[in-house]
Protein backbone atom coordinates (compact mmCIF):
# COMPACT_ATOMS: atom_id res chain seq x y z
CA UNK A 1 0.00 0.00 0.00
CA UNK A 2 2.94 2.32 0.58
CA UNK A 3 3.13 3.69 -3.02
CA UNK A 4 -0.56 4.72 -2.85
CA UNK A 5 -0.34 6.68 0.41
CA UNK A 6 -0.51 10.44 -0.09
CA UNK A 7 -2.46 13.20 -1.79
CA UNK A 8 -3.26 12.90 -5.49
CA UNK A 9 -4.62 15.69 -7.72
CA UNK A 10 -6.79 14.70 -10.68
CA UNK A 11 -5.28 15.81 -13.97
CA UNK A 12 -7.62 14.20 -16.50
CA UNK A 13 -10.55 11.85 -16.83
CA UNK A 14 -11.57 9.97 -19.97
CA UNK A 15 -14.83 8.07 -20.39
CA UNK A 16 -16.29 8.90 -16.96
CA UNK A 17 -19.66 10.18 -18.27
CA UNK A 18 -20.41 6.90 -20.09
CA UNK A 19 -19.59 4.88 -16.95
CA UNK A 20 -21.85 7.06 -14.79
CA UNK A 21 -24.67 6.82 -17.34
CA UNK A 22 -24.35 3.01 -17.43
CA UNK A 23 -24.53 2.95 -13.62
CA UNK A 24 -27.83 4.85 -13.73
CA UNK A 25 -26.51 8.18 -12.45
CA UNK A 26 -28.91 11.03 -13.29
CA UNK A 27 -28.04 13.74 -15.84
CA UNK A 28 -27.42 16.56 -13.32
CA UNK A 29 -25.13 14.42 -11.12
CA UNK A 30 -23.22 13.26 -14.22
CA UNK A 31 -22.65 16.85 -15.36
CA UNK A 32 -21.42 17.83 -11.88
CA UNK A 33 -19.21 14.72 -11.77
CA UNK A 34 -17.64 15.61 -15.11
CA UNK A 35 -16.82 19.15 -13.92
CA UNK A 36 -15.10 18.01 -10.72
CA UNK A 37 -11.39 17.39 -10.47
CA UNK A 38 -11.17 15.93 -6.99
CA UNK A 39 -8.14 15.36 -4.86
CA UNK A 40 -7.72 11.77 -3.73
CA UNK A 41 -6.16 11.32 -0.28
CA UNK A 42 -5.10 7.82 0.77
CA UNK A 43 -4.00 7.47 4.39
CA UNK A 44 -2.56 4.67 6.52
CA UNK A 45 -4.53 4.59 9.78
CA UNK A 46 -2.38 1.86 11.34
CA UNK A 47 -3.34 -1.68 12.35
CA UNK A 48 -3.92 -2.60 8.70
CA UNK A 49 -6.63 0.04 8.22
CA UNK A 50 -6.62 2.66 5.46
CA UNK A 51 -8.75 5.66 4.53
CA UNK A 52 -9.60 6.90 1.04
CA UNK A 53 -11.02 10.42 0.73
CA UNK A 54 -12.16 12.22 -2.43
CA UNK A 55 -12.39 16.02 -2.02
CA UNK A 56 -13.77 18.57 -4.46
CA UNK A 57 -15.46 21.96 -4.26
CA UNK A 58 -18.85 20.26 -4.59
CA UNK A 59 -18.56 17.05 -2.59
CA UNK A 60 -16.34 15.13 -0.23
CA UNK A 61 -16.69 11.40 0.28
CA UNK A 62 -14.55 8.92 2.15
CA UNK A 63 -14.38 5.40 3.45
CA UNK A 64 -12.07 3.36 5.67
CA UNK A 65 -11.13 -0.22 4.87
CA UNK A 66 -8.94 -3.23 5.58
CA UNK A 67 -7.51 -5.05 2.59
CA UNK A 68 -9.51 -8.18 1.76
CA UNK A 69 -12.52 -7.24 3.91
CA UNK A 70 -15.89 -6.36 2.41
CA UNK A 71 -17.66 -3.21 3.64
CA UNK A 72 -20.62 -0.96 2.80
CA UNK A 73 -19.73 2.12 0.78
CA UNK A 74 -21.79 5.08 -0.38
CA UNK A 75 -20.15 6.25 -3.61
CA UNK A 76 -19.70 9.94 -4.50
CA UNK A 77 -22.76 9.61 -6.78
CA UNK A 78 -24.77 8.27 -3.78
CA UNK A 79 -25.00 4.62 -4.85
CA UNK A 80 -24.86 2.05 -2.03
CA UNK A 81 -22.45 -0.77 -2.83
CA UNK A 82 -20.51 -3.51 -1.11
CA UNK A 83 -16.80 -2.85 -1.68
CA UNK A 84 -13.61 -4.78 -1.20
CA UNK A 85 -10.02 -3.69 -1.89
CA UNK A 86 -6.99 -5.91 -2.40
CA UNK A 87 -3.44 -5.39 -3.64
CA UNK A 88 -2.18 -7.76 -6.35
CA UNK A 89 1.14 -7.31 -8.17
CA UNK A 90 1.31 -3.61 -7.29
CA UNK A 91 -2.30 -2.93 -8.33
CA UNK A 92 -4.82 -1.63 -5.77
CA UNK A 93 -7.99 -3.42 -6.91
CA UNK A 94 -11.46 -2.38 -5.81
CA UNK A 95 -14.68 -4.24 -6.53
CA UNK A 96 -17.98 -2.39 -5.96
CA UNK A 97 -21.03 -4.65 -6.07
CA UNK A 98 -24.25 -2.67 -6.46
CA UNK A 99 -27.89 -3.62 -6.90
CA UNK A 100 -27.67 -3.84 -10.67
CA UNK A 101 -24.01 -3.50 -11.62
CA UNK A 102 -20.53 -4.42 -10.47
CA UNK A 103 -17.77 -1.88 -10.99
CA UNK A 104 -14.03 -2.63 -10.94
CA UNK A 105 -11.39 0.01 -10.21
CA UNK A 106 -7.67 -0.76 -10.66
CA UNK A 107 -5.26 1.85 -9.30
CA UNK A 108 -1.59 1.76 -10.29
CA UNK A 109 1.23 4.14 -9.35
CA UNK A 110 3.85 5.06 -11.96
CA UNK A 111 6.35 7.35 -10.22
CA UNK A 112 4.39 10.49 -9.32
CA UNK A 113 1.30 9.46 -11.30
CA UNK A 114 -1.65 7.38 -10.13
CA UNK A 115 -3.83 5.92 -12.85
CA UNK A 116 -7.30 4.62 -11.93
CA UNK A 117 -8.97 2.41 -14.55
CA UNK A 118 -12.71 2.04 -13.94
CA UNK A 119 -14.67 -0.75 -15.66
CA UNK A 120 -18.44 -1.28 -15.82
CA UNK A 121 -19.56 -3.93 -18.29
CA UNK A 122 -17.59 -3.24 -21.51
CA UNK A 123 -17.05 0.45 -20.69
CA UNK A 124 -13.67 1.72 -19.50
CA UNK A 125 -12.74 5.05 -17.91
CA UNK A 126 -9.20 6.19 -17.09
CA UNK A 127 -8.67 8.86 -14.44
CA UNK A 128 -5.12 10.20 -14.04
CA UNK A 129 -3.79 11.88 -10.89
CA UNK A 130 -0.45 13.51 -10.03
CA UNK A 131 1.13 13.30 -6.60
CA UNK A 132 0.40 16.42 -4.56
CA UNK A 133 2.83 18.28 -2.34
From Swiss-Prot:
Binding residues for a fatty acid: 107, 127-129
Gene Ontology MF term list: lipid binding
Keywords, ordered alphabetically: Lipid-binding, Transport
CDD domains: FABP
Record text about domains: Forms a beta-barrel structure that accommodates hydrophobic ligands in its interior.
Protein's UniProt keywords contain Transport: yes
Family label: Belongs to the calycin superfamily. Fatty-acid binding protein (FABP) family.
Record organism: Echinococcus granulosus (Hydatid tapeworm)
Transport among keywords: yes
Name of the protein: Fatty acid-binding protein homolog 2
Pfam families: Lipocalin
Superkingdom classification of source: Eukaryota
